[in-house]
Amino acid sequence: MEEFLYLIYGLIVLAGGAGVVFLVWTQYRKFLQESKNYERGLKMVYLHIHLPPSSTDLESTGSSRDQRDLTDEILSQAQVMYSIIASTVYSGFKARLFGQRHLSFEIVAKDGLIYYYAVVPMSLIDIIKQAISTAYPSARIEEVEGKNIFQESANYNSICGGEFTLRKEPAYPILTYQESKQDVSRSLLNALSASKQGDGVAIQILIRPADESWVDVAINTTKAMREGKKGGSKGLNIGYKPGELLEVLWKPPQSNEQKDDFKGPDEVDRMAIEAIENKIRYPGFETLVRVVVSSETSTRSQSILQNIIASFALLNSTNFNGFKYNQSKNIDELVTAYIMRFFPQSIKTNILNSVELATLF
């Protein structure tokens, strides 16, 4: 009996020791990741992207092409750019610990003028330049200093902003231009065009190649829908709740006739399956969208912010996915995250593919 008690005590001590080691490692890993985020933020370079006016493209290609044709072509070019960026993925221990290297595509409005930037790690400058030039041969890329959107005379309380995250699981797609024929990038441009002297606005679209496991999860989701399992069309957390599991264990087995009653997914699930399968055909990126607005008054800042939020609402799909806006309650943290381009390693459930990103930027 004593030997058994010693064994139990030993197992308890061993489990406690393992728990302490795990806790220490978790905190140490968090410290390493936060330090790496600052290091990455300090080693990023601004690339100013000069794009020719769309009217010039229309005139040069003749009157037979309308704006929609040109938009389709631009979106196709953007998909090429993101496909090249997807090749920057790397593997190994550092990738698992620190996550993939990220970059930021940004639309900045300052004193009524609008600028496009790619803010990238030093190690990725050449490949990002190549990606942009391949997609947009007429674009001119210039390394510059960062644009400060904050006015010295601006009131601290007039700074506002936050982040956009997906409303549902990442397997479900947002509304793209091909489906809605609504040019969201132009809507965002119009929202920023309303800025004037004294206003500063920035939209950051931070991306990094997503782990391939998101595709496996999406495939399991569609499989569950086809088999009519619980949770199939309601999310990626496939399985049973504790109460449902007990019910399954105690419930007598069904006859073959009862099992054959399931006639396959309904129309809603079939649409969801098709949408998910279409999304995973393209490279996926973990994505974080951050917006910061600075103006002379809080009312003015909120007005600009609401116009931007309204533009993102154009990406919301009734049946599938969309964006929800999360207002930042700590302005100091928001401004620091904006300046340093923080992209926490823990953010893994906001995944957009190259088609969805092309609709956005």
Regions found by a protein language model. Give the residues of each.
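Extended, folded cores of ATP/NTP-driven motor/assembly subunits in large transport
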Residues: 2-361
